[in-house]
Amino acid sequence: MKMPERFEFPEGATPIDDCSGLIPVWVHHLHDLNRVEAENILNAQRKYLQGRVGDPQTWFQVKELKVIHQAMFGNVWEWAGVYRKSITSIGINPSLIPTQLAELCLEVSSWSEYPVELTFVEMAARVHHRLVFIHPFENGNGRFSRLIADRFLLAFRCQHPLWPSQLNQEGVVRKDYIKTLKSADKSDYTPLVDFMKKLGATDPSLSELIKSSFYRTHISGEKGLAIVKALLRSGSSPNDQTSNGHRALQLSVKAGFEEIVKLLVTFDADVDTKDKSGLTPFQIAVMQENKVVADFFLSKGAKQQPPPGIGYEKYYKLYRE
């Protein structure tokens, strides 16, 4: 059966010049191609974006990324999950794809082990852009990159963007999106991060990050300090509190995150405000019998007020003996 010679694609998309890999023989028009691809992608989204998503270290690997692309387009294109061999207007030289993709996987894996001053949304934006920049496959790289960025955010229990269908069509939305990617080409990720946030991408709040046992392994030591710095830099309040009134500062004292405590105070967290516990940060430090942190609060102007009840005995032990 005669195959279509060429489809028309929106600005910034990689045109498909060779349709010989098209599997559904009845597809001759772009709207038919869009439909069968959308059905295939929806099935992949159900598989990879629903349910629990593991730490990126367990799945952000070259082999798995190729499997995901194959799952997205394997019912439509024979080249799904196979590295691009052609020179395209977007993307690196095909000979560099294996090395560049492997390096990206190593970098993403390192984010789970070493401190990097990026929020989770900022990390996802870099993942998205780098995959688009590498352009590993013959086509579908934008949609693939967005799904991977979404999966990355879900791994950290963050809300991913609700990407509009207009991204696949000529128009203002797509033009704005392409502009953010071009800014990222110049190492300016702010427009892409803002674009993703506008579409619903969110980081955990500071209080949620510190309180939730899920994030405990992510905020220990220097790694946690870097993430908190990134959240504060991106506009999170040092006086943030949970929906039921537990403040990030008090939660940090309770959890023993001394460096995060100091960082929050450096960013002007209030040292005398009581939270849901009914205690000030100084009083919680006393209850923890942590004189180092208690003295730190005093050095920052906190009121030296003993905790009520049995807390007075601990205060007496620390400051009266």
Predicted regions and their residues:
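Specific position within ankyrin or ankyrin-like helical repeats
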Residues: 218-220, 253, 286
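FIC/Doc superfamily catalytic core
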Residues: 1-215, 226-230, 277
